[in-house]
Amino acid sequence: MSKAACQSFIYGTAWKKEATTALVELAVRSGFRAVDTANQAKHYSEQLVGDALANLAACGISRDQLWLQTKFTPVDGQDHRLPYDPEADLGTQVKQSFASSLEHLRADYVDSYLLHGPYHYPALGAEDFEVWRAMEEIYKSGAAKSIGISNVNIQQMEMLVSRSAIKPMMVQNRCFANRCWDKAVRDFCRRHAIHYQGFSLLTANPQVLHHARIREIAGRCSVTPAQIIFRFAYQIGMIPLTGTTDEGHMKMDLGIFGFELSAEDMTFIENIDRS
């Protein structure tokens, strides 16, 4: 399987705590080949992801068969378990965090490295560009095969693309149906050949899962409402993330590649809950 194919559906590891190792192994054995984590002990157990990767490698699923993404998380998103010296300059913080990630993951490279969220809203500030320059250096070293940013708005994306030497290759955002599934950022990413990853597709949109029309489409396709949402995301060019802890749901999630939504259904879902 190519790295491009690996990346078509990502398994997210936030909030798995001590179950992280077993769940990552289960996800990969169920068919996932892309894993997302972060060097943020407050919400992720990156070292336990590394344990899972080591166990999988021992069973014949090697690192080069997997697509691995982690993140640099600014100090405001961390608890007391910081992976860097908070008194150091930001460039040093990025380097320390990245080195710690490679150690946790028992890897010599990652496929994608993200800034977990900007320091400033609604526009980027000096700190964001300082961090980005450090990430560019990691990319140029070959230790990160791509770099990107998460939790970002359209204004920030425009600034980053226009002012950076190395343009972002990945964006990861939470998607709300009532914001047209982050259409402004998605369209910007498409125009600039940036891969768009969508998370919280189900948890942020419970009203969509229970919508009568979604249930009707699911019945017609002989799938679940959750599969309809994930298939919609994939079909509009999004890379969906799931964090399910249920083996049956993992397999159902990967079943989205076995059917296709009509143009009419796609239009309905894209505009289902606009406010």
Protein language model annotation of sequence segments:
Residues 102-123:
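Active-site groove signature of glycoside hydrolases
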